[in-house]
Design a protein with these regions (language model features):
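Small-residue-biased structural context
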Residues: 1-272
């Protein structure tokens, strides 16, 4: 499975087919856990050492951008979701707050996986990437400040639904979105290409596994729906590539309904 994809652990519904990760099922070439494994596009004649231009690909790390889309979309609509909560409507505020909490946990886990599993390995094999990695670490530290502030601001608003309590949440969302606007494209442009000529598929899959284990219990279908809806085609290709047929069936019959029901509660009366 590409880096840091959907984490289904802790949710009993995630057991079918090994959860909504890259299944590596019949007909999918490449290393364990996913298609397009080592050497997917490098081919004969590729030159250069790990991390250098022209080096052969050793893994498929497209999942970084796929998860980034979910994070960007989810936090990006945060202000509108909060604006759709009527003054004092604590029930609706709790639904929106729970959604933002899920996104916060997902981003926490995504960055934790990179901090513990990626940076040292990448720097050791591609020393020329040291400057990029130092910048990523600094950006993660900044994001941690914003996410910690969000985690602290959410409970009061979820309990009251009052605009006075929403103000703190909105401030933290502004900080998160500003930081994401810098960090995500920087990582995709400067780090992911180095990953794809430096890491093995098993190492990329370990990042995915770290993320999978972090999904809060009961949030599997909601997070899967968020990932799918953030993809350019609505997630059709993502499903075909990442989900084995039995899991796609479970999503269509059970998961999609749960996601859509939650989405209806979540959106409520969004104001322009």
């Amino acid at each position: 499975m590409p880096a840091t994809a959907l984490p289904p652990s802790g949710d009993p519904s995630g057991g079918a087919g090994g959860g909504p990760g890259r299944s590596g099922g019949p007909g999918k070439p490449g290393g364990p856990g996913g298609s397009g494994g080592p050497g997917r596009s490098g081919g004969p004649g590729a030159t250069g050492g790990p991390g250098s231009p022209g080096a052969a690909k050793t893994c498929d790390a497209r999942g970084m951008a796929e998860i980034h889309r979910m994070v960007r979309s989810g936090f990006g609509e945060g202000r509108a979701l909060i604006g759709g909560v009527a003054e004092g409507d604590a029930v609706h505020a709790d639904v929106v707050g729970d959604h933002l909490d899920m996104l916060s946990k997902a981003l926490h886990a995504h960055h934790e996986g990179e901090d513990t599993l990626l940076w040292d390995t990448l720097e050791g094999r591609a020393p020329s990437c040291a400057g990029h990695i130092a910048r990523m670490k600094a950006q993660h530290a900044e994001m941690l400040v914003h996410l910690t502030a969000l985690d602290a601001a959410l409970p009061a608003w979820r309990s009251s639904g009052r605009s006075t309590d929403a103000a703190g949440v909105l401030d933290t969302l502004d900080g998160i979105n500003a930081a994401l606007a810098v960090h995500l494209p920087d990582e995709e442009q400067q780090v992911v290409p180095v990953m794809e000529t430096t890491l093995t598929q098993q190492e990329v899959d370990a990042l995915s596994e770290h993320g999978r284990k972090a999904t809060p219990r009961g949030k599997l279908f909601l997070q899967l729906g968020a990932i799918l809806s953030a993809q350019p085609d609505g997630g059709d290709e993502w499903q075909r590539e990442h989900l084995p047929p039995p899991v796609r069936l479970i999503w269509r019959v059970v998961g999609k309904r749960k996601y859509q029901a939650n989405r209806a509660e979540l959106v409520g009366d969004i104001r322009p």
